[in-house]
Design a protein with these regions (language model features):
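Basic, helix-initiating cap at the start of DNA-binding domains
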Residues: 1-26, 30-39, 56-59
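C-terminal peripheral helix-coil segments that are non-catalytic and often amphipathic
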Residues: 2, 89, 132-143, 161-211
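Hydrophobic/aromatic residues within well-ordered alpha-helical segments
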Residues: 11, 54, 61, 65, ...
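Short hydrophobic/aromatic patch on the recognition helix
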Residues: 40-51
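Hydrophobic alpha-helical connector segments
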Residues: 60, 64, 74-100, 156-159, ...
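Amphipathic alpha-helical packing segments from all-alpha helical-bundle domains
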Residues: 67-70, 97, 117-144, 153-158, ...
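Amphipathic alpha-helical segments used for helix-helix packing
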Residues: 86, 98-118, 135, 168-171
């Protein structure tokens, strides 16, 4: 049963919806608390009853945007899928959702990219949470013999670099038409089939040599 909303909760939700509309329409740079108060039909002083600062409001917008992506991560990690399938779904479901958001409204998507750049300290906690859940999947994979010789932190760093375009909305936005879940599946297969600490000869022992 859903928890009954207080007047404060309802007011915060209504203001958040207005703020999301404003961000999606024209980004966050020109936004002021006075303007939002005017749009909401209240005084600026009253607005501060619901959000104590502009930063608190941006934090609520970030939480609103990330909430469904966090739910995806939680559900995938809690599933009984094998590690390879689990890692694919961990990325694929979030990518599919973000791609649909981009297809629905590229301008709004770009506004969220800019919001993330302007307020990266608000985004960092969600990046860290993603690494936490990825570490859990990597740990399961290592228990089955994958990623031999690597520490969990090393594996996280490498996998983040390999899969970055599928979760980093700034990078994703630039090449979205070239990204697909089919390509992602091949990437995850390559990660599981080859990622380890073993030196297979790619790095020369005596520096670069001319062709």
């Amino acid at each position: 049963m859903a928890r009954p909303q207080t007047d404060l909760d309802a007011g915060r939700e209504a203001l958040l919806e207005l703020m999301v509309e404003m961000v999606e329409a024209r980004g966050s740079s020109a936004f002021t608390m006075t303007e939002l108060a005017g749009r909401a039909g209240m005084s600026t002083a009253n607005l501060y009853r619901f959000f104590e600062s502009k930063e608190a409001l941006f934090e609520a917008v970030a939480e609103h945007w990330f909430r469904p992506k966090v739910e995806i991560m939680e559900n995938v990690v809690a599933s009984d899928l094998p590690p390879r399938r689990k890692m694919y779904e961990f990325y694929a479901q979030r990518f599919a959702r973000m791609k649909s958001e981009w297809e629905r409204d590229p301008v709004a998507f770009a506004s969220y990219v800019e919001l993330g750049k302007e307020h990266f300290e608000l985004v960092r906690s969600y990046v860290d949470l993603g690494d936490h859940y990825l570490a859990m999947i990597i740990g399961e994979a290592m228990a089955e013999g994958y990623f031999a010789g690597l520490t969990i932190d090393e594996a996280i760093s490498l996998i983040n670099q390999i899969t970055g375009a599928y979760v980093n909305i700034g990078a994703m936005e630039l090449i979205m038409p070239k990204l697909s879940t089919d390509k992602l599946a091949r990437i995850i297969d390559a990660v599981f089939d080859g990622l380890s600490a073993q030196d297979r000869g790619a790095k020369a022992v005596s520096g670069l040599r001319a062709a």
